[in-house]
């Protein structure tokens, strides 16, 4: 299992930027797979604690049922759009993909499921300093960090 602390050890600066982007707002978006294989998008909150990325699901929530059946997920941090004329100041956005590992009941009421993220990829999308190129930074455990620029 690849925990958040593994990314922090491998790429501390990249991990810190990704976490700042996730911590910039309370509400995130998670994509899960329905029983028929079609995608489901749901709002969610997550927490970075003890070197782990965790998130929960309330009792009876469809996203929790999705994750118990098929643990694959994609998590998108809060979205903030670049301001016109100030595009170079946009911090970007972060995404995390992986598998949700059921860790037991959530510690808060209402009781639900607590999941740990087994991370397969972390991506930061931003603009270059001149705001002329899209910069995609992605990290995977086997490959490490890669940076691609696009017009």
Language-model features and meaning:
Residues 14-16, 23-25, 37, 60, ...:
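Short alpha-helical segments used as structural interaction elements across diverse proteins
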Residues 4-5, 59-122, 128-130:
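Short, structured beta-strand-loop surface elements
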Residues 41-43, 93-97, 136:
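Well-ordered beta-strand positions in beta-sheet-rich domains
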Residues 25-59, 75-77:
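Short beta-strand segments
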Residues 1-24:
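Extreme N-terminal tail/first-helix region
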Residues 115-120, 129-151:
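Flexible glycine-rich active-site/ligand-binding loops centered on an Asp-His dyad
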């Amino acid at each position: 299992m690849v925990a958040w602390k593994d990314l922090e050890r491998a790429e501390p600066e990249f991990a810190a930027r990704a976490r700042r982007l996730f911590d910039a707002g309370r509400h995130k978006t998670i994509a899960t797979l329905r029983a028929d294989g079609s995608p489901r998008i749901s709002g969610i909150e997550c927490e970075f604690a003890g070197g782990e990325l965790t998130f929960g699901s309330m009792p009876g929530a469809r996203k929790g049922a999705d994750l118990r059946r098929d643990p694959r997920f994609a998590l998108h941090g809060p979205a903030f759009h670049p301001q016109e004329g100030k595009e170079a100041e946009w911090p970007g956005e972060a995404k995390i993909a992986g598998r949700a590992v059921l860790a037991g009941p959530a510690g808060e009421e209402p009781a639900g499921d607590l999941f740990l993220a087994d991370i397969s990829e972390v991506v930061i999308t931003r603009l270059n300093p001149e705001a002329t190129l899209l910069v995609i930074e992605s990290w995977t455990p086997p490959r490490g960090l890669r940076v691609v620029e696009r017009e």
